[in-house]
């Protein structure tokens, strides 16, 4: 059958404390921004991840089309991206004349895919999950599919500099996000065993 969900089991509260995550960040550089392990925001209820509105080749992300045809999830690489997503380019951003800061207005209830500024790595003895909603950050939700498996972005798998995909939806009213703004937080959890197969 078609696999659409992922299920994780935990014994009690398996989340690491901020102190434990700070120690791991110092030891393993769990998240890095341009090779720097300095965090973009304070470590509180997880490691902060910020949004990248600089983009690559003029593209900063994608916005889901409201209406599209049905898909067969088992037909991988069978559909055109343009059938389901609109590109968000630099031309769609608000760029400050004063300091060249970049901002994006999120339309109410629209669904966006953006990229984190930071690269993320998950050691093989850990898993990670994005904190899906934080009322201190704003009236939107990120993240809808926030599981990170052991080995994600791991240097030993030649996968370093792997960014996180940020799935974002604004609620009720338009919402402005700025380049480098903290969007969500990453919480690490220890595995009961090291998996035989890494991400």
Protein language model features and the residues they cover:
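DUTPase catalytic domain/fold
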Residues: 1-199
